[in-house]
Amino acid sequence: TVRADGCRVSVLLEAGVVKFKVEAPDGKVRIPEKKWKRLLQEAKDDSVRVTVARKKGDRWEIWQPVSLNVAVDPVDPYLVYRLIEPGYALWNKMGIYQRGMESFDETTVYENKMTDYNCVNCHSFCGHDPDKMLFHLRAKLAGTVLVDGDEVELLDTKTDKTISAFTYPYWHPSGRYIAFSINRTTQQLHSTQRTEVYDTASDVIVYDVERHTFLSVPGLASQSSFDTFPSFSPDGKSLFYCTAPACLMPDSIGKLAYSLCCISFDPESGTFGSQVDTLFDARANGKSVSFPRVSPDGRFMLCTLSGYGTFPIWHKDADLYMIDLKSGVGSYPETLNSNDTESYHSWSSNGRWVVFSSRRLDGLYTRPFIAYVGKDGKTGKPFLLPQKEADYYAGLMKSYNIPEFVTGKVTNRSYQIRRLAEQGGISVSCSTF
């Protein structure tokens, strides 16, 4: 959709032998779906030429033509995200939803009205598989929902060995394990930011799906450090995480900076290595790292850098940062970042696309932007997730949270989950800590 302030608009689209014009008397251009798909097919590995003309009074104004590059590599067919008001501590209706990438159809994965309007958060998928996922239910009817095909479990992850229930997840590629951080989180109004979210304690553990047990080592669960945001490498042999020296909170929030570290993991024995490597030193670089995510081919890591802390969505200086894991060199992908917040991000299953959260439109609401990533790590210009109506986002009073690509449609299992929540969850236990 193209919008031009209610004026009459004419748009000419060209690619190879395909050429057509779309007229819009009200200024809202709606391109027919079949014609659009034919145009993209013709323009693969090439570009679409777009010429826009607008009628003002008796005159026509014609803009310079622009070219839209069209990649050969497909994007995954579905995008999953949470929709939530960008408030402080209260909520009413929230849910996890999915959107078809070849249409404007949005359907429900789970809405909190099924469980007395509790908090629903932290959805995660194993290898972009729509049939292997998890998310948390908080407050009333609490637990962690674990889905594996037709099998659904609810886990009670509060134990006497941990400081809280399981929090930020990341699946091992085998599906046998899930890394979680365990966070004691606080939210407060802040003198310089709209709000500030921080941890007063946090650890990292790895959960064994088959045994309902979890394990950790002192380096990942210590009172001397805050450890969070774990993620596995694509081969499953390394665990990345963010860590900072423990300090008095909130007094030291402005000085709290997280480094990016890595420890080896043996999936056969379920054990960790003894050596910890630092990939990004917060003290040396003057930045704090969040959300480390490795591309499916293992070549690049995308993360978020901000001035301090561990909740960058409220920090306008938060930017995406790309590390070449082969050379160890990192840089800011300029095409992705803006003058406002860039935060959570995830890769497509083929590693050629990223989707990320940004507040660049109005500084208030988080919207999903999508960008192409070449095999050399170079990024294309991001575009906002398209909607059927040009003014859709202007009227949407909710933020997009945790956008994740998946390779198919997620089955709605809401009633089954509700029954499990009423029955209570399976207790998990500690095997090594």
Which ranges hold each PLM region?
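Sequence signature of WD/YWTD-type beta-propeller architectures
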Residues: V2-F433
